[in-house]
């Protein structure tokens, strides 16, 4: 039955939808009817449709309004419809269908080797981590870099800083390296393979920013289908989601300068962090554009709570 419906959708769409606006409207309707799950770069059917259709047609994501009335060829309509059906039937993330994602206003190549960029840390980068950074940073570490989006966004925000982009996954580092080259930042952003801090020389940074795996087992068991296309290595973090965060907290002070700060995302696992370590003075950051579960600690605060995480030190 599904194959028959797909054939009907394809024939109907290719024959009756003529303009870009028609295609967007039809796609939004199909997405709404399919009860898709969003959250991988968009939070609604309209933005999801736009981010699927425009790259599929090799158009920029910010096309002027008059382009919406442009007519599409039958081959263009067919290409879009095939991707819409794949998004619905397979629950494949749009970014994996187009190999494009956006973060901090920058475009990135992505595929199933990395998570789709979506961290609220982007808002902090655009605000240059004010008021937390007291001096212009010269060394920044992006730990668990994935696609390299945070490292590259930091390099754009702080053009005088060197940025080390760390990940354990060779696949992820290959994607990050492609993005570094695409943005012309080979002399500023440096991909490095390491299991968190374990394989790194002990150098000091003004800022360590990290979006590590933090999904607890309960949430892993109930992940929407869309998120199951993403690499589990970038999501799962043990029963309480803090497996990697504890190691980061244990080792970060050794890699921070005197006035350095750690910014770490733990998402929904912030509940476990607050329950297990109520005495630690986490600064839980707030976001105007949505998001939660990101804390900040200074080097001094990390040193003060070192005993809590001594067991997890490399």
Curated annotation (Swiss-Prot):
GO MF annotation list: nucleic acid binding; protein-glutamine N-methyltransferase activity
Keywords, ordered alphabetically: Methyltransferase, S-adenosyl-L-methionine, Transferase
Any one Gene Ontology BP term: methylation
EC category name: transferase
GO cellular component: cytosol
E.C. numbers: 2.1.1.298
Domain of life the protein comes from: Bacteria
Catalytic activity as recorded in UniProt: L-glutaminyl-[ribosomal protein uL3] + S-adenosyl-L-methionine = N(5)-methyl-L-glutaminyl-[ribosomal protein uL3] + S-adenosyl-L-homocysteine + H(+)
InterPro entries: DNA_methylase_N6_adenine_CS, HemK-like, Ribosome_uL3_MTase, SAM-dependent_MTases_sf, Small_mtfrase_dom
NCBIfam families: hemK_fam (TIGR00536), L3_gln_methyl (TIGR03533)
Family as reported in the entry's similarity comment: Belongs to the protein N5-glutamine methyltransferase family. PrmB subfamily.
Function according to Swiss-Prot or TrEMBL: Methylates large ribosomal subunit protein uL3 on a specific glutamine residue.
Stated name of the protein: Ribosomal protein uL3 glutamine methyltransferase
Organism: Vibrio cholerae serotype O1 (strain ATCC 39315 / El Tor Inaba N16961)
């Amino acid at each position: 039955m599904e194959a028959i419906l797909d054939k009907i959708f394809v024939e109907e769409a290719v024959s009756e939808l003529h303009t870009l606006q028609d295609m967007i409207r039809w796609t939004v309707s199909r997405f709404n009817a399919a009860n898709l799950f969003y959250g991988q770069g968009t939070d609604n059917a309209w933005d999801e449709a736009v981010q699927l259709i425009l790259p599929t047609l090799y158009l920029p994501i910010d096309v002027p309004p008059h382009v919406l009335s442009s007519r599409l060829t039958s081959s263009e309509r067919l290409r879009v419809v095939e991707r819409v059906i794949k998004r619905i039937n397979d629950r494949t993330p749009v970014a994996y269908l187009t190999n494009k994602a956006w973060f901090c206003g920058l475009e990135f190549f992505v595929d199933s080797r990395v998570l789709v960029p979506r961290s609220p840390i982007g808002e902090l980068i655009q605000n240059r981590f004010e008021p937390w950074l007291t001096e212009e940073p010269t060394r920044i570490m992006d730990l668990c870099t994935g696609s390299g989006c945070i490292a590259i966004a930091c390099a754009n925000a702080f053009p005088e800083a060197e940025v080390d982009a760390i990940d354990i996954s060779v696949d992820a580092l290959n994607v990050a390296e492609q993005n570094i080259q695409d943005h012309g930042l080979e002399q500023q952003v440096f991909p490095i393979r390491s299991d968190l801090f374990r394989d790194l020389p002990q150098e000091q940074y003004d800022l360590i920013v990290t979006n590590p795996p933090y999904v607890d087992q309960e949430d892993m068991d109930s992940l929407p289908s869309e998120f199951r296309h993403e690499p589990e290595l970038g999501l799962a973090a043990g029963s309480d989601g803090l497996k990697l965060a504890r190691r980061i907290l244990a080792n970060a002070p050794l890699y921070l300068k005197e006035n350095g700060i750690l910014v770490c995302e733990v998402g929904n696992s912030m509940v476990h962090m607050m329950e297990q370590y109520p005495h630690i003075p986490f600064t839980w950051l707030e976001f105007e554009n949505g998001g939660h579960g990101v804390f900040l600690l200074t080097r001094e605060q990390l040193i003060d709570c070192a005993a809590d995480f001594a067991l997890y030190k490399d």
